[in-house]
Amino acid sequence: MILKYKVYERLELRGIEPFNTLIGSFRYNEDANKFLKEKQKETYDNNTVRKSFFVFVERD
């Protein structure tokens, strides 16, 4: 069984359904976490927009 670690960006805009965008796919957890750590610096939350990131694990 092979695991894939997929990093998603979640964007929530006021009045619009939140949506997720795949921004990276990795074979190893360490690589996904390094990428996520860098992207977390771009996380923000204000009155109109909330931007966050998360990792989803998928089995092949």
Describe each PLM feature range.
Residues 1-22, 49-50:
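Short aromatic-glycine-(Arg/Gly/Cys) micro-motifs in beta-strand/loop hairpins
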Residues 33, 37-60:
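Short, mixed-charge low-complexity intrinsically disordered segments
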Residues 5-8, 28, 44:
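Sequence-level detector for tyrosine residue identity
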